[in-house]
């Protein structure tokens, strides 16, 4: 049986990072997302600069203001967060259909079928983080391991903008020295019960019998017993059927030079064709999307009689669609190429890996 390879991606201070990306004046400042300082709400996310003052998620805004009176208090913009999250989830699904989103800013990916001797899980995680950075200008942290519990644990160990791999060589040492409050799923109430029963770290938890833990925590006790041993058999649950494959890029500065834009269209067509090839799919629709410098989103789609899967075919159609969309007087900040109406390909484009 092939050993599983699971990645857990967790965006860094997601809401605050989106706000700083969309308003560069906030970069490097103590940003607190949730509402006005005088509001009765709670903190959704705080930047790392704000966390230095003791501000954290779920804290009352009034308390956050007392701790960080010079902070930049921002009202949540869920439209922007959802749009960015959709971009990120699309990146995940360009690698695998086995994606389990846990929230707007985190997900598990089962990439077992993608791993090869020359393409370890850690390298795939690096590619995913690179794609997120290039397409959204946001950083993400990743955890890589052989089950979901350890992957999630790993993703929080080297934040922000970091990656940690937990495998059979280091799992025991990591778990034994881990503070009990750092175990995923152990909240304040559970932590207090653990402390009251002499459990302060992973080793203390490991030394408890399964019976003792069930007595203390009921059914959860069996899960805690397994976690202390790095055991988790839960699957990455994905009910989504892939309907499209696509890639988009945000330019560093607004662009209205056709040559530069079409170079990017060629690049995106190639990446899209590569992903279709991995899935052994072809497509009967091609869509080009642009976002103008004024953040207006425009798109145009073409339905095809015969399906396409090659870089050249996708580019030729995308070229026509872009020419229909473009306005020489309006610079753009983003362009995307997506193919849809997927069907099983009768011909698999060959890559170098097919000959190895």
From Swiss-Prot:
List GO BP terms, alphabetically. Answer: DNA-templated DNA replication; error-prone translesion synthesis; SOS response
Q: Which cofactor does it need?
A: Mg(2+)
What does the cofactor section's free text say about binding?
Answer: Binds 2 magnesium ions per subunit.
Q: Please state what the protein is called.
A: DNA polymerase IV
Where would you find this protein in the cell? Cytoplasm
According to UniProt, residues marked as the site described as Substrate discrimination are 15
> Can you cite an annotated GO cellular component?
cytosol
Entry EC number(s): 2.7.7.7
Any one GO molecular function term: DNA-directed DNA polymerase activity
Q: What quaternary structure, including any partners, is listed in this protein's UniProt entry? A: Monomer.
Q: Which InterPro entries match?
A: DNA/RNA_pol_sf, DNA_pol_Y-fam_lit_finger_sf, DNA_pol_Y-fam_little_finger, DNA_polymerase-Y, DNApol_IV, Rev_trsase/Diguanyl_cyclase, UmuC
**What UniProt keywords are attached to this protein's entry?**
Cytoplasm, DNA damage, DNA repair, DNA replication, DNA-binding, DNA-directed DNA polymerase, Magnesium, Metal-binding, Mutator protein, Nucleotidyltransferase, Transferase
Q: What is its main location?
A: cytoplasm
Q: Which domain of life is it from?
A: Bacteria
Q: Where is the active site?
A: 106
Q: Which residues form the UmuC domain?
A: 6-187
- Catalytically driven reaction(s): DNA(n) + a 2'-deoxyribonucleoside 5'-triphosphate = DNA(n+1) + diphosphate
Q: Where is Mg(2+) annotated to bind?
A: 10, 105
